[in-house]
Structure formats: structure tokens, C-alpha cells
């Protein structure tokens, strides 16, 4: 499965949350099916995401690329360190959590 294509299709056709602060809030509330983190996510944010996702039983996938690359894949002109897939849309991105 092409992860990058899956992320892009999910951003275009589904419902996603971009950004670490909003992502942490969504994980705390259990709003989402999958968390995707960039490889260079700051350690404190990474620790928070992993801890809260364990509590809410949300799978976390570490994207093998930087936040700049993740932002570019999402079609955004800024860095994206964390995104939450709430609804995948036409994407098959949720297959990576298995």
C-alpha cells in the first residue's frame, strides 16, 4: 500500500485533523481512528501522542519522513507533525493499523 497516496486521498476526501495540539485534544476525546506522526516530531509531543493514544486505544503510525514532507503530502504550505484520520473517505489508509 502506498502510504503517501493514502494520506493524500484521506485529506482530500475524508476528514482529518492537522496539528499536534488539535491532535492531542482529539486523541483525548477519542475522536479519530488513526494517528500519523512525522519521524521528526518533537519528543515531548511524541510522548504525549503515544501516551494518550494508548489510553484511548488509537493506533499510531510513524511516517518515515519529516514534517515538511508530511505537510507537502497533505497539500499544505506548512509543516505537519501530526495528523488524525477521523474519516478516511475514499482512502484505504486504515489498512496500516492492522
Curated annotation (Swiss-Prot):
Keyword Ribonucleoprotein: yes
Domain of life from the UniProt record: Archaea
GO biological process: translation
Example GO molecular function: structural constituent of ribosome
Ribosomal protein listed as a keyword: yes
Keywords: Ribonucleoprotein, Ribosomal protein
Gene3D superfamilies listed in its UniProt record: 3.30.1330.30
GO cellular component: cytosolic large ribosomal subunit
Any Pfam family hit: Ribosomal_L7Ae
Family: Belongs to the eukaryotic ribosomal protein eL30 family.
PANTHER family per UniProt: RIBOSOMAL PROTEIN L30
NCBIfam families in UniProt: PRK01018.1 (NF002172)
Name used for this protein in its record: Large ribosomal subunit protein eL30
Name of the gene this protein is made from: rpl30e
Amino acid at each position: 500500500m502506498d502510504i503517501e497516496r493514502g494520506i493524500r486521498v484521506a485529506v482530500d476526501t475524508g476528514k482529518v485533523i492537522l496539528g499536534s495540539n488539535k491532535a492531542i485534544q482529539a486523541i483525548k476525546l477519542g475522536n479519530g481512528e488513526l494517528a500519523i506522526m512525522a519521524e521528526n516530531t518533537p519528543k515531548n509531543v511524541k510522548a504525549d501522542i503515544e501516551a494518550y493514544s494508548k489510553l484511548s486505544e488509537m493506533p499510531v503510525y510513524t511516517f518515515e519522513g519529516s514534517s515538511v514532507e508530511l505537510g507537502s503530502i497533505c497539500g499544505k504550505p506548512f509543516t505537519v507533525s501530526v495528523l488524525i484520520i477521523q474519516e478516511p473517505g475514499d482512502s484505504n489508509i486504515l489498512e496500516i493499523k492492522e
